[in-house]
């Protein structure tokens, strides 16, 4: 495995095989493939970590890898199931008073085992893939409006999910390195 700048690194953690996006794919295929690549990156950053490591913050930030994973599960479900399809929130999100505790998913992730967090995220991603596959196309608008009554196209939602997941994959890079010195893609 290589580290920064293509040099071999003894500090690289085991990375699951990630699917490279097909450069000849359609717009819809590329958006889905780039999102999957980022999802796989985030999951790889949690490989081999125990509950204490997943819940360990690295000051001055309060972020944890477990919190990021739980947050990304919420983001997947919220954008594609709740906003795009108009479905009600699933548990545990449905019972949360977000006004009183806006960082609930970050705070409560420490109570869950690493595999529970990974499984929740994988299941949310699987359901998201199904929503995208069953949509009429990238121009299909969300059922639930937001921001002054505006509705979101599936294209916008996928781009937003790529941006959000990639941003948190970058956070996960730093968090993982702070935990055990591992670096990698």
Where are these regions (language model features)?
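Acidic/histidine-rich alpha-helical segments that form the ligand environment
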Residues: 101-141, 155-161
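Short, contiguous alpha-helical
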Residues: 4-9, 14, 18-21, 25-47, ...
């Amino acid at each position: 495995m290589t580290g920064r700048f293509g040099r071999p690194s003894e500090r690289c953690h085991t990375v699951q095989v990630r699917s490279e996006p097909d450069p000849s794919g359609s717009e819809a295929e590329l958006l889905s493939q780039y999102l999957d690549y980022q999802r796989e990156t985030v999951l790889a950053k949690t490989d081999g970590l125990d509950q204490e490591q997943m819940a360990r913050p690295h000051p001055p930030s309060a972020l944890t890898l477990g919190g990021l994973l739980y947050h990304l599960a919420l983001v997947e479900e919220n954008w594609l199931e709740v906003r795009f399809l108009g479905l009600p929130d699933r548990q545990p999100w449905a019972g949360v008073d977000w006004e009183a505790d806006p960082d609930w998913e970050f705070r409560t992730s420490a109570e869950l085992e690493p595999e529970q967090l990974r499984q929740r995220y994988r299941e949310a991603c699987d359901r998201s893939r199904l929503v995208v596959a069953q949509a009429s196309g990238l121009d299909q608008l969300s059922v639930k409006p937001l921001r002054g009554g505006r509705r979101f196209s599936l294209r916008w939602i996928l781009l937003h999910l790529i941006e959000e997941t990639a941003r948190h994959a970058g956070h996960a890079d730093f968090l993982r390195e702070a935990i055990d010195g591992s670096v990698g893609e």
